[in-house]
Amino acid sequence: MKNMCSNWWLSEHYSDKFVKESKKCKYRSRAWFKIDEIQKKNNIIKPGMVVLDIGSSPGGWSKYSSQKVGMSGKVIACDIDLMNPIPNVSFILGNIFEKITIKKIKKVKKKVHIILCDISPNITGLSIIDHSRWISLNNNILNICKYLLLKNGKLIIKSFNSVEIKNFCKKIENSFKKIKIFKPISSRSRSKEIYIVAVNYKL
């Protein structure tokens, strides 16, 4: 059964038009199209900004952000997995939820204008467990904002469309003045992933 599922996933992956297009354009991953769509709809990333990309590897969002902020801005990428270098991107190897990693980030920039997070928890396929893991991860990322996000800063975070998401959105509304829930066209249709775009951090 495991091999059948793996073969099905590989077949779907390589027939995906966004996977094909990302290879054709030499993007680091199909996630490039997601951040591009979010950016075009919301105009979040601007020249001169400092961006923190949490869970950055293989670097699709970091490279995209680097091009948007330009040489007057800066991108800090953080992941537990190594990532190939990108111009104007400072990569920090480490777990964002550990104090030592936050200290390393603060050595580059004390606070940032935008936090991006496209990471997912380990998925089991059991809804009750997966929903709980998503909300736990989302809450932990929201907590990171206290240490690293500037006042009036912005957050783009991946989440999971479920009943629990309403309560999490209320939490975000306590910290940000405005939020949007967004599902990019480039997300697979069967996927329940959504993106929360939050602006004007209240600090």
Swiss-Prot record:
| Primary residence | cytoplasm
GO MF annotation list: rRNA (uridine-2'-O-)-methyltransferase activity
UniProt keyword annotation of Transmembrane helix present: no
Q: What class of enzyme is it?
A: transferase
Can you supply one Gene Ontology CC term for this chain's record?
Answer: cytoplasm
Q: Which residues bind S-adenosyl-L-methionine?
A: G59, W61, D79, N95, D118
In the UniProt entry, which residues are flagged as the active site?
K158 (proton acceptor)
Q: Where in the cell is it found?
A: Cytoplasm
The keyword Cell membrane appears for this protein: no
Please provide an example of a Pfam family that matches this protein in its UniProt record. Answer: FtsJ
Q: Which UniProt keywords apply?
A: Cytoplasm, Methyltransferase, rRNA processing, S-adenosyl-L-methionine, Transferase
The Enzyme Commission number assigned here is: 2.1.1.166
Q: Which InterPro entries match?
A: RNA_methyltr_RlmE (IPR050082), RNA_MeTrfase_FtsJ_dom (IPR002877), rRNA-MeTfrase_E (IPR015507), SAM-dependent_MTases_sf (IPR029063)
Q: Which reaction does it catalyse?
A: uridine(2552) in 23S rRNA + S-adenosyl-L-methionine = 2'-O-methyluridine(2552) in 23S rRNA + S-adenosyl-L-homocysteine + H(+)
Its annotated function is as follows: Specifically methylates the uridine in position 2552 of 23S rRNA at the 2'-O position of the ribose in the fully assembled 50S ribosomal subunit.
> Which family does the entry's similarity section mention?
Belongs to the class I-like SAM-binding methyltransferase superfamily. RNA methyltransferase RlmE family.
Q: What is this protein called?
A: Ribosomal RNA large subunit methyltransferase E
Native source organism of the sequence: Wigglesworthia glossinidia brevipalpis
